[in-house]
Amino acid sequence: MANIKSAIKRVEITERNRLHNKSYKSAVKTLTKKYFDAVAAYSASPSNDALQAAQTSLSAAFSKIDKAVKRGVIHRNNGARKKARLARALNRHLANAAS
């Protein structure tokens, strides 16, 4: 453990920030899983309700990813990659349904 006062403060701040970042990352993962579940439900039985649910969960996931990027929890390229992956999942099923 640190002996110097400023070092002790830095340890406390680092721990606080780590927990804050962890909550954002966890929320992003949770919303991503919910979105993929909604896409799977839509692909199993395509309907307007299932599509609406998938789009709603996509919007929530995008919002949380953008907030995490804005607060510096994840890098902007990482956020862009996550968002592209989410959008691609639904677009694949929409393309299959259209053809």
UniProtKB/Swiss-Prot annotation:
Belongs to the bacterial ribosomal protein bS20 family. InterPro entries: Ribosomal_bS20, Ribosomal_bS20_sf. One of its GO terms (cellular component) is cytosol. One of its GO terms (biological process) is translation. Binds directly to 16S ribosomal RNA. The keyword rRNA-binding applies. One of its GO terms (molecular function) is structural constituent of ribosome. Keywords: Ribonucleoprotein, Ribosomal protein, RNA-binding, rRNA-binding. NCBIfam families: S20 (TIGR00029). It comes from Cyanothece sp. (strain PCC 7425 / ATCC 29141). It comes from the Bacteria. This is Small ribosomal subunit protein bS20. SUPFAM superfamilies: Ribosomal protein S20. The keyword Nucleus does not apply.
